[in-house]
Amino acid sequence: MNAPDATPVIALMDRLGSAARSASTAMAAASTAAKNAALLALAREIRAGAARLAAENARDLDVATRAGLAAPMVDRLRLTDKVIALMAEGCEQVAALPDPIGEMTNLRRRPSGITVGQMRVPLGVFGMVYESRPNVTIDAASLAIKSGNAAILRGGSEALHSNTALMALVVRALAEAGLPGDAVQLVPTTDRAAVGRLIAMPQYVDVIIPRGGKGLIERIAAEATVPVIKHLDGNCHVYVDAGADLDLAVRVTDNAKTQKYSPCNAAESLLVHRDVAAAFLPRIGAVFAAKGVEMRCGPRAKALLAAVPGAKLVDATEADWAEEYLAPVISIKLVDSLDEAIARINRYGSHHTDAILTTNHPNAMRFLREVDSASVMVNASTRFADGFEFGLGAEIGISTDKFHARGPVGLEGLTSMKWVVFGQGEVRT
């Protein structure tokens, strides 16, 4: 008896994978000029198509709202005029970045006479699985183009209209630059089986990059048969040290928590050294109270915040110290030392982004060395943990793993190094 034919979804994904693999060969050989031309064309297409993008995004927002999608997801789904402008600007910034492909480093002559070094090359094909944020479509496309990779993108069903409209712009930009249209492809189905196939096609896909909820990322990490660049959540800490400038500490802590609640680099936990707690906590507590931020407190912190008018105070549970809220909620605890702060961050944090606010340079340097996170900051908001802010032009994700790529993943995170050898007829003896 013959084996059954592949399901339509598997057949579809195999076609996308085969096309991406073929396109990746052309992209690896593409000139910097052609790649930059595609990126600049994409920026023009985004600006020219802003009204259409807004209209398609409104369709997605209407469906999401009627379906009762969680508020943070709806917030991530929204394409505001500012977001559309930033997408175009991001393409231009990526075009302006140096092309990493073909860069050779660490060239050295060996006693045998050969010269050995390393060359930066594209990974090949990456698969992207993401929820809500349709701007990720442009981030992924722009970085794929500049890094000489091909990409297969599978956005969330809630953003289908937005992503389809954006992908049409990408295809036009690739064509204008003479690059293969299959270099960036959008999975044209909301069938979840497509994700299962995408993460299990090592013959076509070299790496998977998931962006979304913890459940999605855990599933992909468990089921993928290709490498995964990932982070599970963002329990980011701000630690106010005994040596903090309190005006700075109030300003930075406020921004880290309230500038936007839904991103994974927003602060979720606040640690305060006992020596400055009485002076600092009522001030930041008043800021949080004015903005409706719920404070889940340890007992010492709660006592110092009790007199703040309008403060929403809740006794913290053990679960709160590790929670990513993505909402106007923050956990607050007093600590007795820098050692305790570092230990708590490494125990309860998610190895994403953590900040120390201090004027004590030795303490700052200890924090940088000993906090085991992908991004560690001194006197700056955790909200800066972003490829755009780090000068990467755009980011395709953030990795909290310790191999290959760590932190915001930009162009170099989509490349690898291969060994190259130059000789003049040397043979091994």
From Swiss-Prot:
State the top-level EC class: oxidoreductase
- Which transformation does this protein catalyse, written as a reaction? L-glutamate 5-semialdehyde + phosphate + NADP(+) = L-glutamyl 5-phosphate + NADPH + H(+)
| Main location per the UniProt record | cytoplasm
UniProt GO molecular function: glutamate-5-semialdehyde dehydrogenase activity; NADP binding
Pathway noted in the entry: Amino-acid biosynthesis; L-proline biosynthesis; L-glutamate 5-semialdehyde from L-glutamate: step 2/2
Key word Transferase present? no
Which Gene Ontology biological process is one annotated for this entry? L-proline biosynthetic process
List the InterPro entries.
Answer: Ald_DH/histidinol_DH, Ald_DH_C, Ald_DH_N, Aldehyde_DH_dom, Glu-5-SA_DH, GPR_dom
The subcellular localization recorded is: Cytoplasm
Q: Does the keyword Oxidoreductase apply?
A: yes
Instruction: List, alphabetically, the HAMAP family matched.
Output: ProA
Q: What is the purpose of this protein?
A: Catalyzes the NADPH-dependent reduction of L-glutamate 5-phosphate into L-glutamate 5-semialdehyde and phosphate. The product spontaneously undergoes cyclization to form 1-pyrroline-5-carboxylate.
The entry sums up its family as follows: Belongs to the gamma-glutamyl phosphate reductase family.
Annotated protein name in UniProt = Gamma-glutamyl phosphate reductase
Q: Which organism is it from?
A: Methylibium petroleiphilum (strain ATCC BAA-1232 / LMG 22953 / PM1)
